[in-house]
Amino acid sequence: PNSTKVVVIGGGVVGCSCAYHLAKFGWKDVILLERDKLTSGTTWHAAGLVSQIGPSAPITKIRKYSLDLYKELEKKVDHSAGLRLNGALSIAQEEGRWQELKRQATTAQLYNFDVQILNKDQIKEKIPLIKNDDLLGGILMPGDGSGDPSGITQLLAKAAKGEGARIFEDSPVEKILIKNKKIEGVIVNGQKIECEYIVLATGMWSRQIGEKTGVSIPLYPAEHFYVITEPINNLPKDLPVVRDFDSRTYFKEDAGKLLLGIFEGKSIPAFDKTNKVPENFSFGEFPENLEHFEPYLEAVSYTHLRAHETEADLVCRLLLE
């Protein structure tokens, strides 16, 4: 195409969602450009946790809308989002956390979400593999769970096309054209595409792209980790997602294995030697860093999870901060 009204740059879950919603609400002349393949940036390796309650009313409304949308689009475009709504359990070791979780439960009730406040014995009954000695309690959201990030992205992309948006893979944007502080277009594979608006949905590349256009985007990638164990016998398929904010960990069932992730307070900056994300970092991973992950793994193994005699594969991922 030689021209369009809107160019969405980036074919992850955010870019495909933007393309779908723009087209859905009347912006029919929408093009999405992905430099490689859809999901190849950071979407493909996301843990895919799905929750309804957010830190604020607007975020809670967005999360509820998103989950309802995925269910609706699955029927409309006949593509799976990989939803597994087995519930999500947030647990507390400390009194402050316990009070916070109970406030979240009150908020959930205000939005008519199904929520259960559990004591430590009820938690043990619900999830036997949790060691509950030091727990004060937790809240269970039966409507939460997980989804397939790649499946959700493809679902949104298919829905966007159905609304008239056009999606092009293997189409790296080489330059954003600006004149008199106004967007004029983009250069893709040596070809100019005129446009009036650009939506930047480029994840960890956003800061570098912004710098080229004189826009400061305060975003920097950091290494992020999760572990996937070898298969565990008799691991329940309907195991809820468990979040332990005090230990900065979460875990969920993953094809008969256990996926254990962390949300560390201080992450390791990625690409700190070059201070630049490589252009060709598609479906990329980092080398193992057991030294960084081990303290979290030990805390979980001996505090909340029985030590399973399984060999764990460390998978190094990205977290945008």
Give the role of each language-model region:
Residues 9, 193-203:
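Short hydrophobic core segments
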Residues 47-126, 248-251, 255-259, 284, ...:
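Dinucleotide-binding Rossmann-like beta1-alpha1 core, especially the glycine-rich loop
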Residues 2-4, 189-197:
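Core beta-strand elements of the Rossmann-like FAD/NAD(P) dinucleotide-binding domain
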Residues 25-42:
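Glycine-rich FAD pyrophosphate-binding loop
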